[in-house]
């Protein structure tokens, strides 16, 4: 397992990431993976002897004594099944795990293969990249579950219609003479039961509509609201895919690029090891690697996955990449896009009713605008963003399980978010309250994944995966960051002392004229 490395002093304001092994001073880390229909990919790094924290002097530093070589090869030709009677405990995602092929005695195949360039290279991040890391999310903030284009078009039209109707009702009421207003009030009092019955019928129809459009996920067992048909949503997904392809058409890596092959290899391995999971085999998975410093990755409902090279430079090993790609697979398999679209449409419909009431009741347009702004913010921060965080947490949970079934070191998932949190703290970035974000905070993600890892380790054992190496990479990361901070403090202290020494006053030596010395001697 690898982690953050090559960190320079905080005074330099640079952070470096690279694939490297958790070895002592000079080690080799070979991560190989194979799957049907994919080329074999190996990530191989030679780590130079540690000579300090400078980039030109070292590639990484760690604290493991002795020699350590880690080889990992995934075999996709695993057959057979292992029944599980604890489907509820493994999140109802599968009832069987594929096991190692008997031809290989169910042992991890150890061999070295031709190396390809790594997914990430050691490089200093620019200020723009640092800002991107701070805002990093595995899926775009508002496109993790993309809203269909039709709903995006209808939303402003619905809002405008509600404002016009509400304002029209207010103007009509204000224009009525007092006697007419009394007549209207009297009619309302006489027909209050009819109005109550009408509103109750509307509410009942709404409840019936809601429950008849619920669908239970076969993976999580959770009910979700689906308002659009699968065919309609497929067409909308194709439109969105074409829009993304048009935007990135000049930045796509070729299929022969080493980074593309590496991502494809990991994705193919995840799909192969989880083909028994409902929905995965029904999706045609296609990978697109975009040459861009943007640190992001997202998947469309039709299985089109977009990964940016900036994202690849931010992960430190295959295990982290497996978890993050599993997270994106989970978004697509769980139907988060369709679910988010249905929930947004429902909230917009209810919001349109409240908006009409606001513009009808408020006596002035300025007050109505203020109430409308408050209503939109309440909807955003009390419903939309919490719901988005819920979907992200669910994708983390299922993505962790998919990575566990693929025999990845799932402890790396927690390390990744610790890295993101460390970058924020290293640059003094203030922590934004989680309720303001569409994604869980890095720290909360670390805690959540750490709670899930023991269960995922059991699933990994059920799938006859090879045992994980010790020590725990989470512990190593904490030791590394602690050591780095101590070294940074020492370096900053030395710089401070040097500055103080440079600023000390130096006594000026007066030049005594030679004639003065001669006169003094002759006089004596």
Curated annotation (Swiss-Prot):
Supply the InterPro entries for this chain.
Mito/Outer_Membr_Metalloprot, Peptidase_M48
Location of this chain's protein in the cell:
Mitochondrion inner membrane
Q: Where is this region: Stress-sensor region?
A: 165-195
How is this protein's activity controlled?
Protease activity is activated upon autocatalytic cleavage in response to mitochondrial depolarization.
Spell out where the chain crosses the membrane: 196-216
Query: Which GO cellular component terms are attached?
Result: mitochondrial inner membrane; mitochondrial intermembrane space; mitochondrial membrane; mitochondrion
Identify the stretch(es) annotated as Cardiolipin-binding: 148-167
Targeting signal (transit peptide) range: 1-13
User: How does this chain sit within the bilayer?
Assistant: Single-pass membrane protein
- Give the protein family: Belongs to the peptidase M48 family.
**What is known about what this protein does?**
Metalloprotease that is part of the quality control system in the inner membrane of mitochondria. Activated in response to various mitochondrial stress, leading to the proteolytic cleavage of target proteins, such as OPA1, UQCC3 and DELE1. Involved in the fusion of the mitochondrial inner membranes by mediating cleavage of OPA1 at S1 position, generating the soluble OPA1 (S-OPA1), which cooperates with the membrane form (L-OPA1) to coordinate the fusion of mitochondrial inner membranes.
Name used for this protein in its record:
Metalloendopeptidase OMA1, mitochondrial
- Origin species, per record, is Homo sapiens (Human)
